């Protein structure tokens, strides 16, 4: 049995009980969904099993909880997009930057990116929410991660991992669709209830709730000047072959850092 202290009260739980089960017992005490827990002050995901500790709950009203929500929603969106478009038709799908209280996603490939297409992606996302698909986590070697992302056509990530110093990385998946995320996730897709996809320029904006009101989507506020500036920065990176950290590492490793600095100046 594990002794778990919650709100000053200690209760016994059988070994093998998950934090998800404990969270369900206390969900009625919270206005917003419990997404993570703090075990002796350290964050853990809900699939972890109980142990002797002092426990507190993290909801979408807390920064770590909202971050987990947004990561999980991003992964679910990517899976839905690839499913609707067909994996072989997606040339590029990347969350570039935040804009207008949302996240701008650049999308290129053999598809027509319009409202009808995005409505199909949203419908697929809602299907995943209804199914409450577990978001699985596995640890793999860095070499295996490189091989995986090359196989999936995610060459930017494979390029990045070639310079990673640690020997293992965490891979998250939804129903077989895998990607790398640095940070915690919610337990299943059923928690990702609020989202929207809005066409914008050469991509779309993924809208998600804010900590101020986790049950409501903020209005999208186009910011044309900021978008133009961020787009110009992205285009400059492409011209310099510096679209991501992996590309920057390549230039540093090849001894071109001084030339790069002069070019930027």
Question: Which role does the model predict for each range below?
Answer:
Residues 6-9, 38-41, 108:
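Short strand-turn-strand beta-turns centered on an Asx-Gly dipeptide
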Residues 8-18:
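Short, contiguous acidic and Ser/Thr-rich linear segments
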Residues 28-32, 84-90:
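Short secondary-structure junctions
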Residues 34-48:
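Short acidic beta-strand-loop surface patches of small beta-rich interaction domains
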